[in-house]
């Protein structure tokens, strides 16, 4: 164990910290002194300039004989100042350089002394007076801002000191508690050893006395041992508590340390530069530039003998640069302005853990804190960005005021024959008192507002810097703690490339494809800003020619991808909407009729190049598709226009930004809504078009699955019905890898396991079943079976719609009246329907032939047997006797009153039986192979299947009867999902869909309720009603998939034998 003498003591650590803080405090004081000194030099320089021009004006009146004397006077003074402070030419500040060249030029001045004298007295000197006043005033305010920032920095350092002291205190308590715990353990060992020795040394006594003594000694020893154990437990709890406090204190210390270093770095690198550049020097160089340019304008009208010297001064004036002067100043006083060394973590008493502890029990706290920091940072960045924009606009206004080009005095030399004309000209220009008073008042008011926003911006940036440093450290630590050693293999997917890849840029096509697949229902898409780091990474990848969004991975932030798409259009050198058509497009917005507006917009846009129109057509088709999910993503066409308008169409300069932006938003909204009427169709303009099916193109991996034709995809009803039909057909799959579910809804399975897939929950998840348990299955861990009969055939949407509109041609009636069917009857029905199913590959024709409207008791009983066929086959070793069926028949048939079995046709159950791959999953591989390859079936196998089917059906009916009167219990699936937005809404379970959906869509009946506990027992009969009008399946995140949210159905017509009414407030599934 390391000796404590080697560790730094608390006093040593605090002393080192105090020393470092004192050095920083002294450095901050020297910074203010340095800035004060620069202000004094500046004021002195401006005062010298005023004196210079005043004296020069007087000398001009006495001709040029006195100019040499004046020049020598100031040249001598300048030489002495330069020798003392500026020994090297490269360290001379630009204003001082101009001053030196100006003095050298004075010797040349000998003509036009009267005009120059008037200009000096009435124009240039007042300018320097204003510059001096402005410089002093601005420096005072700059000093206040700098002092505030220094106070904030010292406050951060004091907070770090407090956190460090807290860390020392808790760590010392932890060490003390540990030592006390060890002492208690030693006492316990000592007591146990002492007890053993006393028993060994005990001398023999009389029986009675010996027994009494032993009892007393045992009682004393037990009492002592219990006391020691209790003390040990208390000290153990105290040590655990103190250790946890020490860990939290160390984490807090590390976070504060990171935030302090970031604040110090930000102050020295950014804040000082901004204070000098944007506060102290605000308008100084520009005003000085104007004054000297006034002088230059007068001097350039002199004789050619002056040009050589004046060119040198002009060059120096052109080089008046605040940035260069700031750099020279910092180089001259490098020790004052250089950032100090970073604060390093000081381990206390051997605590060498210099990283955040992200393990339990502080991990959840750190995760929550990281999320809170991220939310807070998002808000602060938006607010600070708005303040920055306001500050920059105000700064531009001030720069416009101080850079007014009013230094030209060439009019004063327009062949004036008298001094009166010159004086009148001068007085009418710069020194007009009403004009200058108004200008000065406006400038001071703008400056006050600017400094208010500047202070607010710097304080906000300071807070963001601290929070960002903490957030980054937390995120880095949490990311490393959750990283696993082995990565799971992922299914590789091929990226489809368009034939005309040059027509749509890769970044546009890839971002839109990704959002169409994963982000149509992402709330706040294009409105919420994403991570700037991820936006830059994705942008850089596209610039390298890569496609970072290719494949099925969904590990990108949706807001960042949306930001990349907006950034691309905002950064185009030639925007999609050129400025030369801006007025024509805005004129279209004034039309009230939406159709007429679309026609006029089309006429204006048709003049654009074809590649631009192709991109516009592709983009706005996507935005229209996105707006159809406004209930989920909260982005209707108007919101999309607000977010996308500034990126696509900028307001030209010289226009009112606020009013014009409102027109631009209305224009983009109109194009989104009327994009089909505005842009040419593919026949008129060849090129790639946005396909709404793109988001669904990778949902099925089966090579036998049929794809929807382009002609059918344009019909909403057909596409929606086709989607509903696909969801009703289970698919068999094989696990590629082992998978362990992370939540209660995720299924766990081993490599090679057979899985049953019901429907797609998202791009990354399936709803399915394994080992009789329903749940979610990851898509990238499975392979869909590709056998001749392994993929359920799908009927075309057109044929199914026709079948829905036609009356039923055949009806299957029950063979018995009020009694339940026998086992032989069930076998006949089962075999007959298997043969019909084989002969009719079109599911639509099967549905047409076997639609049943029998709702009497007889059909209910017959359907109860069909229910068993559609349910999961449960093997049973006990045969079902025929004499038992009539006995149980009345009980089973009575369930139809509230179980709604009368609404299930034979065809529905039998078709579901045939569609389900569970029919192929029998006891031996030979049976499954015979079903898949359509080989002759073994009679023994058929008998076993029929026996298992009837047994399963009767067991399920008994379970249904038992639970029909039971109290409703919470549904495991429904109660764990998020609350649905619309009410009433039927939540889907993880059971396979059945053709009952199609029948209910055709013949709507009131929804019956069931106990939620039967969801795992009745496999196919009880399914939630699916609405005909479905937008698209929900695309949830990969970490926790969410079920599809269906809109409210309109099935209100009562059934034949039903008397119950649907209850909207109940969360139970309905039939």
Curated annotation (Swiss-Prot):
Q: Name one GO cellular component term.
A: dendritic spine head
According to UniProt, where does the site described as Arginine finger lie? 527
Chain positions found as Phosphoserine: 206, 427, 500, 691, 695, 724, 795, 916, 930, 990, 994, 1013, 1027
GO terms (molecular function) for this protein are:
GTPase activator activity; protein homodimerization activity; small GTPase binding
By its UniProt entry, which Pfam families does this protein fall under? FCH, RhoGAP, SH3_1
Gene Ontology biological process:
actin filament severing; dendritic spine development; excitatory synapse assembly; extension of a leading process involved in cell motility in cerebral cortex radial glia guided migration; filopodium assembly; inhibitory synapse assembly; lamellipodium assembly involved in ameboidal cell migration; negative regulation of neuron migration
The residue ranges of the SH3 domain are 728-787
Q: Show the ranges annotated as biased composition (Basic and acidic residues).
A: 181-203
Q: Respond yes or no to whether keyword Manganese is given for this record.
A: no
Could you tell me which residues belong to the region Disordered? 181-211, 700-726, 795-819, 838-918, 984-1012, 1029-1071
Q: Which residues form the Rho-GAP domain?
A: 489-679
Span of domain F-BAR: 22-325
Q: Which UniProt keywords apply?
A: Cell membrane, Cell projection, Coiled coil, Cytoplasm, Cytoplasmic vesicle, GTPase activation, Membrane, Methylation, Neurogenesis, Nucleus, Phosphoprotein, Postsynaptic cell membrane, SH3 domain, Synapse
Q: What CDD domains does its record include?
A: F-BAR_srGAP2 (cd07682), RhoGAP_srGAP (cd04383), SH3_srGAP1-3 (cd11955)
Question: Coiled coil where?
Answer: 363-401, 940-968
Where is the sequence biased in composition, kind Low complexity? 855-868
Symmetric dimethylarginine modification sites are: 927
Subcellular localization(s) per the UniProt record = Cell membrane; Cell projection, Dendritic spine; Postsynaptic density; Postsynaptic cell membrane
UniProt cross-references to InterPro entries, sorted A to Z? AH/BAR_dom_sf (IPR027267), F_BAR (IPR031160), FCH_dom (IPR001060), Rho_GTPase_activation_prot (IPR008936), RhoGAP_dom (IPR000198), SH3-like_dom_sf (IPR036028), SH3_domain (IPR001452), SLIT-ROBO_RhoGAP (IPR051627)
Which ranges are annotated Polar residues under compositional bias?
705-717, 874-885, 897-907, 1047-1071
PTM characteristics? Methylation at Arg-927 is required for the stimulation of cell migration, dimerization and localization at the plasma membrane protrusions.
Q: Can you quote the domain comment?
A: The F-BAR domain mediates oligomerization, binds membranes, and induces plasma membrane protrusions.
| Assembly description | Homodimer. Forms a heterooligomer with SRGAP1 and SRGAP3 through its F-BAR domain. Interacts (via SH3 domain) with GPHN. Interacts (via SH3 domain) with FMNL1 (activated by RAC1); regulates the actin filament severing activity of FMNL1 and actin dynamics. Interacts (via SH3 domain) with FMNL3. Interacts with RAC1; specifically stimulates RAC1 GTPase activity. Interacts (via F-BAR domain) with HOMER1. Interacts with ROBO1 and ROBO2. Interacts with FASLG. Interacts with PRMT5.
Q: Any idea what this protein is called?
A: SLIT-ROBO Rho GTPase-activating protein 2
Organism in which the protein naturally occurs: Mus musculus (Mouse)
* Gene designation: Srgap2
